[in-house]
């Protein structure tokens, strides 16, 4: 029966079965599955009978209310069937039951169609995987009827309650299953017991979106939810109740099916519909070429009018949520002398040149069009592309005076000046010589730091390169090697889309110059494949003037591919390679439309059984030859040609007028008679129009001997007859005697055609023997080589035409040697391209198939296998090619010398090979060579057996070791290898014009992406599946070196890992759990689990990694590989033995070629908002330093004492969030009705408090802490985290209150659970106020301190949160914090304490309370002791009149030194040079272990590190950083989403931010730069700011260098994120729990979270869009499937969402209105009104509005001057109204007012505003007003000034939501 793979493809003309590769692959998979999936399983040995049996029954359909099971099978109702629990049963509709039924398309069986092949016939596929094609000869209506599919299920126990209610129920399926398979309720079905091996799926594709899944999660999902279960198309998978996936496609041996069994050997493929796409469009010179054969548009129109719209449409059809980045890139060439007055950019020091200095000067350009834009905004993307195309060529062709290196410099430097007017000084290079590798390398930087600042809603990064070329690129060898190393170490996929027609050679093809020194020492990256294809350039005598002018797009060899051949006077070596990490496609809108139209038409019947005839299409030639174009195609300018007999002395040529030479060369290939339809399946380098069937190729193409040879015309007629006439069968030629074979003239026929594969494209097909000048040969040769039916021991030989001088000597055989069998091939070579018409010349060449090796001058025998591996079939070269990887460069001999150019003979030397002897097992062994090389080793025999047929032209890539030669030299001498082995195994060396005949193994050509392809893809079609939903790197692979290669070519590092019994509970307790975690960690870092026969051969305890019981066995061996690193994990007793294999580095090469670890690359990049191109210096090098796997495994096992900084050393996954204070939603205030009297600041603090309670509730407590908790105390509420709330910035707090911070107990939030024994615990019913007051103020009581809040200093007070905790821990009958608050209010009612401002009752939070006078114990350390007792209960002003100001620097220094003196003896800093005076260390953040899986849905502990601020100013951002090593990101995302809902209720916006600062974004993302904004007018002199401490009345003065810049940012609703590291005192060691502060500039974030801003040292602004700010918005995630359309968004209501500015706000923040005494003419600089729905809908719009409004304000000199004056005036007014400062008011001025708390930001509004808007109760409002009146208003801070001006404050405007 014909396989579906044999008829796939839009251009298939004939009717062919599956290709040989497909059949071989399917047979391998089937055999592997049969061997692995036994029909008699150990757990159920009797469940699968030997022969299937059927049983008819009635099918029911149920819903979820009836049962949640998909299938119910009542075994008692089927007593005669013999079913048991565990059987695999197939459900199919009974014959005739579905006839005539009208089913919906989704209800019937799927008419499966391969994407990209629109003309593929669609067949209903059943569970067995084979199409129902036996009815082709029957009724057409029957063939077109849709039939229900077949469903598989495993019998489970029948629920007893269902049996009791429905005893007659036989089989029932769920509604969704019935709809998917077309089952009807009460219909008759057949039940068939199936063997698991018969129904096992080979591949299963699953899709997911809006999730970040690690590959370890995919592995766990597969083992938990898929293995040993039947699956079906459309099935929903739910893992851990959170991770969701859908089964997209199911394959059995490459065929799609609806249902199958997921065996342990099934390969899962995970595809993401929410990925990050980076589209590179190569703007080479061909992009502006016109399409001469199509519409006449330029090639760029194909991109903008057809390709991109089609891509966006397909994304919209699948509802994808991708982020798109588009970059235009090109390389501009400057190849002419530039005058000295030209731009400095044309200086040689600024441009790139070739390594030899002879190449033209070039400069690479990158223009970012869009960056991280949602795919739904395709109209914006296309508009941006069109606009950029208009100016791109102008911008890159006219160089600027010089390239700026910073964004600010780009704004200052004019593009053109009078001295340097614009001048076109360059032109784009061709696509061949473009900078494609550099672009790929730069784009891969997206994954270099993927563990830092992780986006938790997207998975995968795909690079798409659109090029106008044909897929051939000339690249530097070193960059190709470095890029291959980088890409193989990162899980990133690359798609290459070519706009030009596909050439007739292998693509994608990288052409590179080999290093001059081609030998290296052992340890080089020795490939497990054959040597790369290398050929030598001809000398200048063979110039391109003698070649056919193949200078148009679409030719067999493009002009770019032929440029420079023969141009160098000295010989240069070239290599060709096909990378495994590139997926190539070809886009032609005409073919796409034609294929779409053909897919809609009805297919016609074919005379051939089991095939389908395609609609006829016009013949479109792929090759355009100048000779054919110049003559009429229908003209008859042919002449007879005769081929002379071969001469034993020289190659005789005969000149004949033949204009058909080119025609013969273009169509002179015929399929092999023994190819069985495989040769006609088409390949990537031969057009489908050339495919044909031949009934008898011996009669029609290959005459048996010279007597039957006819003239060329008759031969062509026979050829035409063979093309246009179909024959059902081919005949093999008869075998003739050896004598006759030796006597007659043999012709060689072309190789067989194979279906190409994706990543190797056309390289998997058969060689193209039409030598269309691949190496500058001055003739075109047509050869037909007859394939002999010899034994496998006799490999085919490669021939080269002998020269005139050495032909006789070579042909003379040695005595006592067997007579060689020779063959002759015909060659038609064009003699010149002059005015006379070209003539066809016939020549012969000798093929020696059995000859003894002759000694060569280089000590080399032609038998050398390396020589055989590297020689080519083309006659263009006059010397043997260089050897393979194990061959040093031989000396040139007489035969190596180039032939005389005047002779122009097409002959070449005969390559004579040594006789191979046959081993006992039938393998071919090379004869030992004496004194040839100083290397040793043997070639694996299986390579010769597998690929002997293909070594005639160029051997295929081997799967074993590289070829080593025997040597009689020093056995200890290291082997030498080829330089191009550095590219292996990630770039396959290939002869592009004569690729191997036999397809190598899939693992050899697909590399790491082998298991992504269920079936062999096509090169000609666009890989839409990869472009729509890119696949994650497969979990498994099959590439593994042999045991001998691991020993010789790899460095081994063994170590053992054992479980720490004393470790915390979150680490695994068993060896199996530890092994799972070790495998998961490696999968998360890009490793793949190696499976297949190679692993079985090297491990005795190998078991399938998808088997749930496999990892628990002793001796289990797991191989994992990533690039050049292989890990072997072996379970040995109770330990795990890890052996790390690292490929030896390259040695022996020139330093400038390979030994350098990186290359400095300086492209010119222009980002979206950049004014000009800026130079970037990028290091194109290998991946970062090697991961410390020993420490990582020890960390997983619980050994963590030796790790000092696990976050950075072990590369934890890290993400950072901030809580931004925004306006409290009106709807949320109803939920906190008890806090109506609170101001907004207090509500924000309450929200943080609620979050900390949640963190404490889900906090992981280690066993050592858990054991100290009694059972009675475990039920009590967790204590909130100890966060110090301040109204100053952290740097000010550290400088002013260093003593207090050092005395703070860092473990208060981890206080002991019990302070008193159970016998001493208090009870509420027997306590007195006096006794309780003594306990509270005692040694173990509540902490009493003097605390400052804004402008007031409160003495001897305690915090409500701490008092609640104390009550909870010291009272036996108080178990919850609510009970403690209730008891505290009772105490407050009885007069034990009161609020410091008498505004609030007792609350659990950051509220200050004081003990009543009658119960107070005077503390000598308190400031309250300095005053009379009657004044102690009141808060005093912050600025006493009797104290003068002190110098800030001296005061800070004195305070710091005092702190050091007092604490130096207590601190022990290792390595300190001054142990007596060490730096005090202060941590501004703490961490705890948080359990993200409180419901225990995962099979492992899910614990992360949660870092939070220890010191927090309510006006600033509250920082949260998460880090984890082996947790599930989806559970982390779920925890974050629960925080979002809690924070929103209290006016806090949880926003994800980048971990690095905005100014350093270019270091990690080359295509992003901050946008600079400069002030049009310099601000006036900076005023002096002051601050006060809680322990001193002295007002400390500090200069605020960026006072006005901070005021501008606050004006535009920015809040402080992080301060610069220079803001902290230099004599204090400040750090966070995640590291030390490293920000160079202070950073602010907009309240929407959309924009980051920094202030540089020069006072400029740097703005950067935050691409994460909307990723965790519940609205965006809920409605993300609507592509952010504003009309479809209805987010939850927020305050001020729909409030216009002219309406009074019902919330705290009033609308900004001009006040008397201010200039109302100054317009507000607040950004335009932006609602919450707009912010969640379009981040670009929000970002642009903020940027534009801020830029407009900073560019308006009048507004700036008015703003500066207003700020100075307002600050002066607030300073002069201050009571204590009035004595020194004579010193005040508008620019230098009195020193006050300018550095203390505040959120609190004036009391009058607060009282009016909050509607406080009358007594409370009066008390607040009185307290405010008693307090002097010392306002010199930015907040105080902003509140007194008419400019919109952070509380005014629509942003406060």
UniProtKB/Swiss-Prot annotation:
SMART domains documented for this protein: DEP
Listed InterPro entries: DEP_dom (IPR000591), DEPDC5_CTD (IPR045838), IML1 (IPR027244), IML1_N (IPR048255), WH-like_DNA-bd_sf (IPR036388), WH_DNA-bd_sf (IPR036390)
Major location category of this protein: membrane
Subcellular location: Vacuole membrane
Low complexity: bias regions: 1469-1483, 1719-1730
Record field: compositional bias (Basic and acidic residues): 741-757, 1454-1465
Top-rank lineage group of the source organism: Eukaryota
Pfam short name (any one): IML1_N_fung
Keywords attached to this entry: Membrane, Vacuole
GO biological process, one term: negative regulation of TORC1 signaling
Region listing for Disordered, in residue ranges: 1-55, 639-690, 724-777, 799-818, 833-943, 1426-1496, 1711-1730
Residues that span the membrane, as ranges: none
MF terms in GO: GTPase activator activity
Biased composition (Basic residues): 726-739
Stated name of the protein: Vacuolar membrane-associated protein IML1
Source species: Coccidioides immitis (strain RS) (Valley fever fungus)
Lineage: Eukaryota, Fungi, Dikarya, Ascomycota, Pezizomycotina
